Amino acid sequence: MVFSMPMFYDWIPRCIRPWLYIVLAFCFQFSNGMYLGAMNQVVGQWAVMREDVQMCLYATLTGMALYFVVLFRMKFRFTNQKLLMSSALIIFLCQWLATLRLPLPLLWGLCVVCGMAKIQGTFECMSNIQLWMTPKRDFGVFFPLLHIILLVSIEYSGFLAAWFAYEMHWEYMHYFVMLLMLLVLLVQAALTRPFHAMPKIVPLRGIDWLGGVIWMALFL
């Protein structure tokens, strides 16, 4: 297959299109429901236990794991632009709500939703540049490159969260990610057009949503 990114307008240089999606993938990977780098400040300000904040991380991972099984169904149903913009908007709202003093069960549910949007945005970015990274679809090449993005984002998001918490306030990390999501929305609104990966839209019928809710309750 020949690599192309038809979701971009024709005036966007082809050489920078995949790099833009790598930047967007980093933006999504920097997001989290709560940031453990600022755990001490959150525990002190909210008067909660460390385990309560750690549970936010587990809830985010639960959302990512549960939503992973429907990523391709979503890709075959909605346009690339719609998936990325909706993911960015959901993460933006989750980041803002996470700075409020919500009841812990509600905060954990918010982190689940944030995790779903995080993996949706990352998957949509990386799946569109897979042929650029490895024209033969060699997963021995693709996954190491993907893991570079994931591991760098994990390390630097934790570092940034700790730096913001020490120098300013822990909420600034959430504001920073909100700015990143605005960047994603701006790129998608200004540089791309609706593009569907499939010649025919595949409906969402047949997905066991109730089973997903039960598994989520079991994991949490």
Whereabouts are the PLM-identified features?
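Interfacial helix-cap and linker-helix signal at transmembrane-aqueous boundaries
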Residues: 42-44, 74-76, 107, 156-169
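Small-residue-rich transmembrane alpha-helices and their cytosolic helix-loop interfaces
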Residues: 25, 57, 61, 140-155
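Extracytoplasmic
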Residues: 12-71, 121-122, 126
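Helix-loop-helix hairpin linking two adjacent transmembrane segments in secondary transporters
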Residues: 146-192, 203-216
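Small-residue-rich segments within alpha-helical transmembrane domains of MFS-like 12-TM solute carriers
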Residues: 29, 33, 99, 115-123, ...
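Paired small-residue
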Residues: 94, 105-114
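Conserved MFS/SLC helix-loop-helix module at the cytosolic interface between two early adjacent transmembrane helices
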Residues: 65-104
